[in-house]
Each structure stands twice: as structure tokens, then as C-alpha cells.
Amino acid sequence: MMYRSLIILLTATALACNNPMSKKSASDDKSNKKVEELKHNKIYELPADLEEISGISFLNDSIVASIEDENGILYFYDLKQNKIVRKLQFADNDDYEDLVIAGKDIYIINSSGLLFQIKDYESEMPVIKSFQTAFRKKNDIEGLAYQPKLNRLLFGVKGHNLDSSRENKQIYAFDLKSMQLDTNSAYKLQLDEIESYFEGDVIEENSKKFLKGLGNQNMSKVFHTSAITVNPITDEIFMLSSLNNLIAVLTPDGQLKKVYALDGKKFKQPEGIAFSADGKLYISNENGGIGSGNIIELNYAN
């Protein structure tokens, strides 16, 4: 009798394991995690001066402030006229990564964490200052964003976090009143959370390249922060990775909300991300050694 009961129990267990409904209930928390592709809406091919375009930030719905990652020149590019309408030399040649407009000022960061402030950038004689932060070359700062409600800048780390952790990519806050950096991270993008978006029975074709990196013990090979921006409508933080062409979206309190993949060959080397005031999302791409750089308006809706 005991032997028969054991057979019935094992059979029931096997049926439960093979029951698709049982599998579904066990993975309900993953079923709503799906990587969505963002396709391009408009593409703006850029002149030779911006072949190595890095960061972008919008003055208005037409004019984009931009930098090139090798020279200390600030470019103002008009999307409607398809031309550079102004140039401003702010520093010598260096490795400049991102910029952001904050009120009447523009801030630019280099990879070693040197922050430039261009005060009253619209004036004929803007004042330029620089601030050395706690970051160094090994941190490889590539993202810079502005949170107006908190009056602070955000720095996105591509390389080493300040606490040397490898399981996440951190964002740090710089207070614009005190002009001081908080060395404790403001946000953390957990890399295993990114990985969880690619688990399941069906793996999208564009994620296969990404999944090859998951076997690496160093999880930083999964996602490299190349730019960050703040959605002016939702206050969400958008983190761009040129590695695997991904965008991770964090809620204002730092929770991973969404992962997007960039679709199309025009995303040669995505290095900049920005919203226009009306909530349109744009990506800037270096030329990748072929052709011209570009700015792409994405088919994205808040």
C-alpha cells in the first residue's frame, strides 16, 4: 500500500512539473519582463566636425548642444537647418564624454571626472570654470544628467565604481548649491536584473550577442554606461549602454522599470542620449569609423 502511494505521489509530482500552467505560475514575476525594441523615427546625418559626437543636450526643440570626444569645443547644431550654428571653445583637447544644460549654464564632463561649468552660455563672454571631482581615469565617467527638482547633476560610471563593486553600475549626485560630489551612490543598476530580462523560452535575436557576455565572471561586461539623461515628464533616469545597444530605465526612486534595445544599423556607436522639452527621445552616434555621425529621434512615447 505504501509502495502504491509512493508511485501516485511521484506521478503527480511529474505531472505538475510538466504542466505548463505550473511553470507559468512559477515564473509570473518574469513574464512581464520583456525587452522592447526602439526603432528610429528621424535620422540627422552630421557634418565632419561631429564624426566623433559624444554627448547631447537640448536648448529647445530644434537646437542641440553637443560635444566631440577629442576637442574642447561646444557645438550648437540646428536640427531644422541641418547645420552647426555656433561654436564655443571651452578647454584644450581631452576625452570629453557628456554634457547637460542646467538653467543658464552648461556642464561638461571628461572621462577622468573633471567637470566644466560654462556660466551663462548664451552670453558673448561666458565664464568657464572647472571642478575636479573624486573620480579618476579608472572610473571612466561617461554619463552626465540634470535633476532640476533636486538641483543636482548625475554622473554615470562606465568603469570602476567608487566602492569598487562589480555587480552594478552606479550613478552619483553632484549638488549644484555646494558644488560638492556625494561619494555614496544615488542609484545602482544591478546587472543581474538586466540579465533577468533576457531569460525565458524565447530569446530575441538581438539579445544573443548580449547573452554571450553573461558567462563572464566580470559582470561589468554586460552593460557599459555611455550616457544618461532624465525624462523631463516622468523624472525617470535613462541609462544608455553602447555595449549591446541597450537603454535601462530607472524610476525616480531607483528601481529598474524597463529595458529597451536599439534596433537598426544606424546605431553605429551610441554615445549620447537626451530628451527634448516635449519628451521626444534622441540618441547620438559616433560614426564608428565609417561615414558620418548622426542624431536619431526614436519612436518613443511617454
Role assignments for model-derived ranges:
Residues 2-9:
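Sec-dependent signal peptide recognition
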Residues 13-16:
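C-terminal motif of bacterial Sec signal peptides marking the signal peptidase cleavage site
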Residues 18-302:
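Sequence/structural signature of beta-propeller domains
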